Amino acid sequence: MQTPATVPRIFSQARRRSRWQRAAARQGTGHAAGFLFEILAEEIEDRLGFIRHEARTGLLIGDPSGQAASLLEPRIPHLERASPAVLDEEAVLPGRYDLLVSLGLLDTVNDVPGALLHIRHALEPDGLAILGLLGAGSLPALREALYLAEPDRPAARMHPMIDIRAAAALMQRAGFRRQVADHFPLKVRYGSFDRLVADLRDQGLTNALASAPPPLGKTALERARAAFLARADADGKVTETFELIVLTGWG
């Protein structure tokens, strides 16, 4: 694990917490998109059913939608919930657990190997970690639209993301006794650039880069909208891809 002084600061911890808090507030309205967390919650349920892992203590990190919490609370007598702050680079997780679940956060941690070590150390013997995140195959339509919005001076508006091979290697490097890395694409249809951006805000998936570029100007925003819709099918909708990675590891 790298020391705090040597970890590259790609992501802003403050911006990551802020986007999560905004997502939690939007989810509370009852009108926010939550499909990614719904699918991740289903993946957790499938794994727990298949593995038949009995847990008395658990920690759930993230999940602004509350969907995973609704699934886990009836199954785990002592379930704690935590904000993204517990996966900050200098943080040590607050206890030892039979089950630890993190959703939508690991891909915006500066020191991923260090975070995985903290997670493994927070597991009881034979404890289980299930970690859901967006993978490197995500959001190709959005990436292209943002690039074409500023063709002369493209800004870094999209995060670097972890691919499935790197994710599996990082789990092994962190010392999990056994590990499984799964990934699959989710295709979502959009009628506008703005609807996609709203869905990302609803689910806490917007920009958390430490060196954030200025907002798109009016002209650049119109270019982004046009470039996005240029990918539309005959029905006027664009297919966007979310690559979901689910990592399972035993302590």
Feature annotation, model-predicted:
Residues M1-E42:
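N-terminal, positively charged/glycine-rich alpha-helical extensions of SAM-dependent methyltransferases
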Residues S102-L105:
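A short beta-strand submotif of the Rossmann-like class I SAM-dependent methyltransferase core
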Residues G34-T57, Q67:
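Conserved alpha-helix/loop element of class I SAM-dependent methyltransferases that forms part
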Residues S65-I76:
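Conserved SAM-binding loop of SAM-dependent methyltransferases across substrates and taxa
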Residues E89-L100:
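A short acidic, Gly/Pro-enriched loop at the edge of an enzyme's catalytic core
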Residues P113-L128:
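A short glycine-rich, Lys/Arg-flanked "PGG" loop and its adjoining helix->strand segment in the class I
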Residues I130-F193, T206-P214:
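Conserved catalytic/acceptor-binding region of the Class I
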Residues A32-A33, F184-G251:
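Conserved Class I S-adenosyl-L-methionine
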